A protein has these predicted regions:
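Residue-level detector of conserved catalytic or cofactor/ligand-binding positions
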Residues: 306-316
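Terminal or standalone catalytic/regulatory effector modules within metabolic enzymes
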Residues: 26-28
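Active-site gating loops and adjacent loop-to-helix segments of metal-dependent hydrolytic enzymes
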Residues: 263-274
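His/Asp/Glu-rich mid-to-C-terminal helical/loop segments that flank catalytic regions of hydrolases
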Residues: 283-299
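Alpha/beta enzyme core
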Residues: 7-24, 35-62, 69-85, 89, ...
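Thr-Gly-centered strand-to-loop micro-motif
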Residues: 224-226
């Protein structure tokens, strides 16, 4: 299976989220940050174990570390050929530089996020629309070969090049959602309902009443950022209420790093094979993705994604 866009990979999830489907049948697709190519493989292996779709997210920092947008995109294409049974999307996360985002589209990313949430409403609309128009028409995979996520409202916390103090956060205003989506033409909307980037000092207080109002305003995918540290029961409630994409970054870094540290402690000093050091990290990531697939009710949903893809415009 080729790389999919977020619109394609979440068609079935969004259908269930925006109709009177039984809340127990709804599910969200997990979106996970990576910093290295072995982590990319671990993400896909975890999804394969659960027959689930998955979204691989690269920050600009991760892209710089790996080498380039083109290198990341080529790695994703190779992984897609190696694991054809796993539907997945390559996503550029929280990008603010318009030219970098457009370069990612041309390089072969199948979803990009324009984060203009710290701008005023009209500027956010203008930038998000510019990226949506470009992405929908300039992907190497053809028309609609790249989809777009934007953010309305601001999460507190630190996400590499985006930093918002707790005092500066702003919840998503439901009254602005329909206008924002209609005027921009985006495919997924990241909402601010009480989560934050990074680890929490205390459990977040998610405003479920706000999520309910936002869900009524649009029929595109809703995205929950700041998934690290959110209690399992809150995840389940978000999914039941119509969240279609859930982002996890910081927590996954800890899972990987803890496994690598443990491997280093247990290996003899005469062992120099780096695969025995980073290999446990890759396995730990796969196990975490398998667990999150169950939590998000996404396990076993790969066939539904394949069916949903047929209802979207085919890519060249």
């Amino acid at each position: 299976m080729p790389l999919l866009t977020i619109k394609q990979i979440m068609t079935d999830s969004v259908r269930l989220a925006t109709t009177d489907a039984d809340p127990k049948d709804r599910y969200a697709v997990g979106a996970f940050n990576f910093s290295t190519i072995p982590e990319m493989v671990g993400l896909v292996e975890g999804a394969r174990e659960k027959n689930a779709p998955v979204i691989l997210m690269a920050s600009i920092g991760a892209v710089k570390y790996i080498g380039s947008l083109e290198l990341v995109a080529e790695a994703a294409k190779g992984i897609a050929k190696t694991y054809p049974e796993v539907p997945f999307c390559l996503h550029l996360d929280h990008a603010t530089n318009m030219e970098q985002i457009k370069q990612a589209v041309v390089a072969g990313f199948t979803n990009v996020m324009i984060d203009a949430s710290q701008e005023d409403f009209e500027t956010n609309i203008a930038k998000s629309k510019e990226i949506a128009d470009f992405a929908h028409n300039h992907s190497p995979y053809g028309i609609d070969g790249c989809s777009v996520e934007a953010e309305l409202g601001m999460l507190a916390g630190h996400e590499e090049n985006v930093h918002v103090e707790e005092s500066g956060k702003a919840y998503t205003d439901p009254a602005l959602v329909k206008e924002f989506v209609d005027r921009t033409g985006i495919d997924a909307l990241a909402v601010a309902i009480g989560t934050a980037h990074g680890f929490y000092k205390a459990a977040p207080k998610i405003k479920f009443d706000l999520l309910e109002e936002i869900r009524k305003q649009t029929d595109i995918a809703l995205v929950l950022h700041g998934g690290t540290g959110v209690p399992d029961e809150d995840f389940r409630k978000c999914v039941a209420m119509g969240m279609s994409k859930i982002n996890v970054g910081t927590g996954l870094k800890k899972v990987y790093t803890d496994a690598v540290r443990e491997a280093i402690k247990t290996l003899p000093e005469t062992e120099y094979d780096p695969r025995k050091i980073v290999g446990p990290g890759r396995k730990a990531i796969a196990a975490e993705i398998a667990s999150k697939s169950d939590l998000f009710n996404c396990s076993g949903k790969a066939p539904a994604v394949k069916i949903g893809r047929a209802s979207c415009r085919e890519r060249v």
